[in-house]
Structures are given as structure tokens and as C-alpha cells.
């Protein structure tokens, strides 16, 4: 697996200073965008994580290249997982699930792993089968947790809230409001608000997340998947994942999120179809797991070096978060890109995809890899300006890919390239700049 490659500092500074700034003497389509970092491949998301125990060490290399954090509802991870996290750019978040946590175990873990950053508080206190606490009961247990976080220099995350079953406190906002109003408790105690959500409607998830803006804190969505109502098949879960991850990555309010759950005891063909890992030995990613790993981090601080083929899923911005993606079946594009990725299966009129690309030399042409059952026309915008239209005649297939080409002279440097489908619909696999 190729990992994200950042240019050496000196080279990066040269590229940024000479290629990613406006140059008044260059042609009209020269880069006029802010400074940034040129990379070979998209970095992994700083937000993406899982709620999982990682008891099988073979699961670690499957997910760790694509996630930055994990928690398992406990005070510590397994020893194998802790070692792997330390050497693979991940952090583990200890949790005080209820009042029966071990402060000494947390202290020992942080001492052995000084890069630990966060401490999670009570798990779903307004559910009777979870932490099961009224705001007053939780407040009585709160000061030692605040003190522990300060002692260990950890940022404290609020109790994880969901719609609950505790009498009088089904509404998570009501529980939190009363909790933060308790003697000895302050909103300033916490760095972020933790929430859980199992609504199957992506728009409902968005509304739920934004409901917690009132606290003026970052939001951590620490458990989620489509479960209520139960999805009818795995394709529904896949569509949900696309919409929700695109939202979570693009929403500034959201600082972190964790999928529930990479593997359960149920078979893969059982609802709610949310498993990322197979039950085989050795395990592999499920198609849903591939999507979770390969969906774009939408990182606008980096510019992809277009010396390779750019996969359609490597966008940094899109107009509609309901864009549907699936593991790519375009072997030619995948081989040319040198990285696993996804294809867009519902690129429809009105949709927009934005890419941040760097080219070291003057380009001559843009190629799009696509297929579909209708004739399509795509607008090409470069650095904020409409440049041309790309004809994409139907090829009558969902598995065979064809190429549409158009002249495109880009000066060396960083450029935003936006594809906006004007009419028709198609699947999109990749784009390529040629010299």
C-alpha cells in the first residue's frame, strides 16, 4: 500500500512559493489559489475513527492506514493495538464509561503512551441499559474525572449522548443542559460534545449533529451507522455511508467521528449490514469497509500531484453530499492511479466535483474515464472560471469504461478543477492531465 508522500520541506517550500501563488505574467488560467502542500496521495482523514476493540491483530493493518483514532469503551486498548497505534499514526482515547473506571489504569496507559490526547466521559447516561445516570448523579461523579484529565493533560470529552430511555431525559439536550447547570460542573470542563446517532436518514443525521451547535464546542460523533429504521439491504447502508461521511468530512462543526462497528458477531448478510471487516481468516475489508477507508477526507490544505491518474473519489468538495460511490471496477484507472479508490455511480445533472491539482509542467489535455446509459455534457471550470464543455456520449455499460478528452492547457502550478454535469447522468472513474 502506498502511503501519503509529502515532499521534503525544502522542495515543498519551493513548490509552494513558485507554483501555488498568483503570477501576473502567466496566462489567464494560471493558479491564483492560496499556498498549500503538494502530495502524491490524499492523507488520511484527521476525523475518521472507529469504536472497536481490535482483539484480532490482523484487523489493524486493514484499517489503520485510513483512520486516525479509536476507542473501545474501556480504559485501555489491548497491548498489541496500543503498540500498533503508536507506530501507525493513530491515537487511542480512554473512556470513563460510568463511575466504575480505573483511574490508575488510565494513568499507567498515558504514562506509557504520552501522545494520548483525550479522555472520553460517560457512555449514554440517559439510557437505562448504558451508564444510566440522571444529570445530578453524573455530576456527583464528575469532579474526579475533571481532575484526572487535568492531571494527565488530557482534553475531556463530554458524556456521549443519544435519544434515551431514562425517564424524563429522553432528549439528550435536556440531559446536557441540566448536567452543565449542576454545581461543580461547567461547560468549560469539556473540549467537545460527544453524541451517538443511528438514524437511517442522512438529512436527519445532519440536523441532529447541528442541534448541538448551541454549546459552541466541536462535536464528536462517536457511534453511528444506519439502524433506525433498519436498512433493507447493504446497498442502503452504502448510500447512507457516502452521504454521512461526505457531510462529516465537510462540516467544520465535526472534529471527529467513529463508525459503529467494524465487526460484530452477526454474519455479514444480517441487518443492519454495517460491518467493515470480514469474518474470514485472514480478514479483509468488506465492500462497505473499502468505502469507509477510501472515501475522500476532503482535505483542502493539500494539492494532488497530477503526474498520476486522479480517481474520481479524490475530490475536496462536492455540491451534494448524497453522491453515491462504490469500490471501483475500472482496473485500468486503478492501476494508473496506484492507489485503491472508488467510482462515482450517480454523477447527475447539477452535481459538482472539485479537485485541487498540481502540475509540474504545462498540460495539453484532460481525459475523463466514464460510462453510462445516457448522453452527458460536463462543464469544465478551472480556477473558478468556466473553460469548456465536455461531450460524454453514452456507451451503454456499467462495467466497460471509455475516455472523453478535451484540450486543456494548464500552466505549471496548483489549480482547482471543477466538473459540473450540465446534462445527462453517468458513472465517473477518473481524470487525467496529459502533457
Short names for language-model regions:
Residues 113-135, 156-167, 188-197, 221, ...:
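Active-site groove signature of glycoside hydrolases
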Residues 158, 164-167, 214-241, 259-278:
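Active-site clefts of carbohydrate-active enzymes
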Residues 94, 123, 173-211, 215-229, ...:
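Aromatic- and acid-rich polysaccharide-binding/catalytic face
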Residues 45-119:
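N-terminal carbohydrate-binding/catalytic regions of secreted carbohydrate-active enzymes
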Residues 91-93, 253, 260-313:
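Aromatic-rich peripheral "rim/lid" segments of glycoside hydrolase catalytic domains that contact
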Residues 299-435:
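Extracytoplasmic
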Residues 8-15:
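Bacterial N-terminal signal peptides
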Residues 16-42:
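Bacterial Sec-dependent N-terminal signal peptides
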